[in-house]
Design a protein with these regions (language model features):
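Canonical positions in the second alpha-helix
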Residues: 30-31, 64, 96, 129-130, ...
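Short coil turns that delineate tetratricopeptide repeat
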Residues: 36, 69, 101, 135, ...
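Register position in tetratricopeptide repeats
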Residues: 50-51, 109, 116, 150-151, ...
Length: 279
């Protein structure tokens, strides 16, 4: 392993293990200094900045798209040249399956960035390509479905959700299927899927959010509130969750409760404004 690769690995581990945002940013920027074509570093910088500087996060995500596409083309060219070689010239250390998996991972990461940029058609296409490169990535079926759902392509999204659920259980997939069925007017079927989402969910913040949304669609406001509150308590740094519970209280005419969460947002915004100035 080259010195550059070992240094990059060290910086990547440091970035992933630290809880300090400034240190994460510093590590990823150092990786870029070592390798300006590393798409993962740009991708990760976009993720970090998304908490407090939308302009910078968008910039880094867009740069990562260019880097991922460049890396994919490089892999394709290398794979094409390798496959054209006579068998006697091919290295036994190279497994074509590993190359396809590597390309597939690049496509998957590209899909994640497109999702972050709200470019859902491009995201779904990237996930489809990831699945073509590595059929073992069954979870791509779910990501394709969600991107299509966000792009209002409900019929195609439903197809991928059903295929995904035929291969593995997923409370999140049940939720999106329920939403599509409700949109199509299949009320009874959608209720079954909302209950499946609730029954199969776990005991974490994301599960509680899905339970809250499902109970709200089932008309049980008290349980919807219970799980929204629980979701925020388990992940108090997630600003989107706090906005969700504010919207919930406002929709149900509970302005005082909404105001209490607005205060949490105000405090967080003050902190984020300071971070934006210093980073």
């Amino acid at each position: 392993m080259s010195t550059t690769h070992s240094t990059k690995d060290f910086l990547l581990n440091q970035a992933q293990n630290t809880t300090t945002i400034s240190e994460k940013i510093s590590c990823y920027k150092k990786i870029i200094e070592l390798d300006c074509d590393d798409p993962g570093a740009f991708h990760s910088l976009g993720n970090v900045y998304s908490a407090f500087d939308q302009g910078k996060s968008k910039m880094y995500w867009e740069m990562s798209v260019q880097k991922y596409e460049k890396k994919i083309e490089s892999f394709k060219d290398s794979a094409s040249k390798y496959l054209k070689q006579p068998d006697t010239a091919k290295s036994s250390e190279i497994d074509p399956k590993d190359v396809f998996q590597e390309i597939g991972q690049c496509f998957y990461s590209l899909g994640e960035v497109y999702d972050n940029l709200d470019e859902y058609f491009q995201a779904s296409e990237a996930y489809k390509n990831a699945l073509k490169m590595d059929s073992a990535k069954v979870f791509c079926l779910f990501d394709i479905a969600v991107s299509l759902y966000n792009d209002d392509k409900f019929k195609e999204s439903k197809k991928y959700l059903l295929e995904f659920l035929s291969k593995q259980s997923s409370y999140q997939a049940h939720y999106f299927l329920a939403m599509i069925l409700a949109h199509d007017g299949s009320v009874r079927e959608s209720l079954v899927e909302f209950w499946s989402c609730i029954d199969e969910s776990q005991d974490d913040s994301l599960s509680d959010w899905y339970k809250a949304r499902s109970y709200n669609n089932l008309g049980n406001v008290k349980l919807a509130e219970k799980y929204l509150v629980s979701a925020v308590q388990k992940d108090p740094e997630d600003v989107d969750l706090i906005y969700d519970i504010i919207s919930f209280y406002e929709a149900n005419g509970e302005g005082q409760k909404a105001y209490e969460y607005y205060e949490q947002i105000r405090v967080k915004k003050d902190t984020l404004r300071l971070m934006k100035k210093t980073m």
